[in-house]
Amino acid sequence: MLNILSITAPIYLSISTGYVATRSGFFSKLDMQVFGRFVLNFALPAMLFNALSLRDFQDVLHPSYLLAYALGSVMTFAIGFAVWRYGRRENLTLSALAGMGVSCSNSGYVGYPILLQILGPEAGVGMALTLLVENLVIIPLGISLADSGEAQHASWQHTVLASFMRLLKIPMLWAIVGGFVFSMMGWHLSEMLFKTVNLFALTCVGIALFVNGGSLVGMRVVGQMQSVAWMALFKLCLHPALVGLMLWTFGGMDVSLQIAGVLLASMPMMGIYPILGQRHGQEGFCAAALLVTTVASFFSISLLLWGLSQVPAWRVATGG
């Protein structure tokens, strides 16, 4: 168990450092937003491009993984949506936000740093494929349904199109596309450009964790504990269980990729979740869910890592 804590403890200590630095006033919430934009628009895209472009194409394109992760995530989304919509009698917008929250992980800020310690350079491939599913399937689905709940005059086709148009402005997606193209064509950056991109990629992990902690400052859970507890349970337990089931059902992929899928699904929800909720006046609910899920994930991820470490295939995939 100490080996597991040696993986998770540095991650959450880094998150705590960001929280304390922001809470004490050393940095402001506005500073965290600037750092966050740097990670999302420069550091993370650079890391994703390197992870894909430096490998053979057959090593980075895994249709079975994409399909398995997408199915597991959509199933989780559907269950979360149904529970809030029909079980808790919530409106369409909040139900859609709940579905998105329980099925879309914080892959870049928390997932990648953990995977990097376990799988090494292979972590980037699993994360890039997961980000494709999240950004092309789960987030557009959630945003479209949430917008539909407040824009009865607009057709769902218009809402979906608007969501995809917003996605075209995300540098991460272009980095993934560029990485796939370079890998497929066998292209390589010049040494000067490679070193430049790599400098940005190396800044990703520490700043991402620091920002994740700083973003938690000011979030409140008062009066919403029951709702967000269900969110945490679905995100940290149901999502990895369904993704793991789909990965096992499809099979035919490297064990390290299966481990990456289960671990990424077990991460807390994405850091921009409260921002997405703010567009619909639900930032309080989304922020509370993010806070509780992030804190609880230290224990759930540590337990999951311990369980996976007992499986013989884990030692083969991780070399440990």
Residue ranges with predicted function:
Residues 1-320:
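Alpha-helical transmembrane segments of multi-pass small-molecule/ion transporters
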